[in-house]
Amino acid sequence: DKLRAAQALSPEDVEVQRAATRMLPAVRACLEDELRANRIRRARACYDAWQTLQPRDAGLAEARRQLALQWIAVGDERLGSGDVEFAVQALREAQGLDAAAPGLDAFAARVRSAHAGDR
């Protein structure tokens, strides 16, 4: 949070940029670790931190795609066990991250169908 505040006040400051660069490997590792452990909410927090540190980093697009795919996978699993509410949330998260993620349209159709049947 302190770094985010410093970036907002002095984004071109050399020390602020150095601090962001030092933190970046830990933030990337955080995202990978949380995705591997299937903790997608925590993974999203790591992704958000990465985006704050390096908003133009080329790796963000792939990270967004991976996170969207994980939301789809977990949402689909939970939908299969009857948790429509979580599936709706997972769909929103995936759409917000990567509207072109493979499998998103099919997942959206399954969620809509289940949601309509839930009413």
Where do the language-model regions lie?
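Short coil turns that delineate tetratricopeptide repeat
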Residues: 11, 55-58, 99
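Canonical positions in the second alpha-helix
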Residues: 6, 50, 93-94
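TPR repeat positional signature
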Residues: 24-30, 64, 71, 105
